[in-house]
Amino acid sequence: MRFGSDSDQDPWQQPMDGSHASGSKAVADGPGTQRTQYPYVTGSSIIALKYKDGVIMASDTGASYGSTLRYKSVERIKAVGKHSLIGASGEFSDFQEILRYLDELTLSDHMWDDGNSLGPKEVHSYLTRVMYNRRNKFDPLWNSLVIGGVKKGPKGEEKYLGMVNMIGTHFEENHIATGFGNHMAIPILRTEWREDMTFEEAVKLVEKCLLVLLYRDRSSINKFQIAKITTEGATIYPPYSLKTYWGFAAFENPAQGAVGSW
Amino acid sequence: MFRNQYDTDVTTWSPAGRLFQVEYAMEAVKQGSACVGLRSRTHAVLAAANKAASELSSHQRKVFRVADHAGVALAGLTADGRVLSRFLRSECINHAFVYDAPLPVSRLALRLADKAQVCTQRSWKRPYGVGLLVAGLDESGAHLYYNCPSGNYFEYQAFAIGSRSQAAKTFLERRFEGYNDYTPEQLIKDALSAIKETLQGEKLTSSNCTVAIVGRKDDGTVEPFEMIDVKRIQEIIDSMEAAEEAPAAEAESSSMQEEDKGTDAAPMDI
């Protein structure tokens, strides 16, 4: 999902010495500049869902350099302003750049000092424009972003959860999972998610998804972070590990019953 | 030889600390036919007196929709006003495109004021000769701003600009304290009454005024900025006249106050 899967165009097969310029994949932006066309350090799935009091978001704290699990303690979920959380899969430095954009926005709101602030809906819309615009410059920000939040509207407290990806696809949902989670966690969320879940129930559900991803996604690690956003504001909890059980029959003998050469 | 040596360009100060060109632009606002604006917590109403340039012509439009949540009424050079309302429209639509949300009215008024201010500080420009009443709705409720050619802007509960606006202001000053809790219908009536004050004896009809409203219903749904139907305005005027005649027409009191010129107002005073 996150980066090209054609094996003959695998980014990791490209030379890393900056000689992209000779390849057909590089985009030159005038003389002397050369933009990153492939992800280098990437984070894996984000899981997020609405629950009774707000939105909960979770991810592991790993970041891979190619397929090497290079960094084990990076925060991929951050608070934006007073009403929103953002979580990111994909290129980690691109995420940091996005955070800088958002900081600029919230700072300027603060400086106007007129009481106006961006809600999750506005942040999501803004990011949608940024992501689609960069994709159209053939210089995408290599991420799938999840934006969750709660803000008081004219009709009372409004929960919001949406995502946007590197090509500008965007939508709102009650539960969202990016990356591998889009394949592995969505089926679980679809059967088990309810509108009126308590925080404890939501944490249980999220942990179930994270554990499945830990078992099946080679680039996930057993160090997770959960965050929530409610009317009280954002809380990002310290990282912790889940208990694993590797004694399942399918893990013991993965080849059994598998049709194919392996 | 010259009556005033300090008014040949906008950026030149008089020794008394005044910018004459800016003041002249503010005078232009007083030449235009009157506009009033007033608001409750949830609704804002704009009204304008329409005056045709000649018997043979129609009048110029003075009330413009800027976006679903905001609109303006203007007095002064309508041509300048059209330029500014186009600017406001583009600001609103750009904000809506990026953030999928309406531009807060305070920000809208601020951008307008900043634009007007630039014209008072550039030798090759002239100030806009138009005053705008900006009415709109945002998260914090209904708002009304007055934007002046000088680049100053103020928020109001109720205000009037244009020729003979002092009469309307006097009317509004007597009544504004209750406006926060007014219904849309009551706001419209007071807007029409205020406009009537500026007509100086001329009869108020649906053909010589424009009224527009924007607001939010109790359930939170937005009632977009909209010109009120001519037929409905006439009905309201008729009902007001009927009510007036009932309790023995209380003579047209001594409300013939002329504009308060003559007084040595401070330069930036509105």
Swiss-Prot record, chain B:
SMART domains: Proteasome_A_N (SM00948). One of its GO terms (biological process) is proteasome-mediated ubiquitin-dependent protein catabolic process. Its main location: cytoplasm. Residues 239-270 are annotated as: Disordered. The keyword Transmembrane does not apply. It is found in: Cytoplasm; Nucleus. GO terms for cellular component: cytoplasm; nucleus; proteasome core complex, alpha-subunit complex. InterPro entries: Ntn_hydrolases_N, Proteasome_alpha, Proteasome_alpha-type, Proteasome_alpha1, Proteasome_asu_N, Proteasome_sua/b. The keyword Cytoplasm applies. Residues 245-256 have a biased composition (Low complexity). The proteasome is a multicatalytic proteinase complex which is characterized by its ability to cleave peptides with Arg, Phe, Tyr, Leu, and Glu adjacent to the leaving group at neutral or slightly basic pH. The proteasome has an ATP-dependent proteolytic activity. Belongs to the peptidase T1A family. This is Proteasome subunit alpha type-1. It comes from Oryza sativa subsp. japonica.
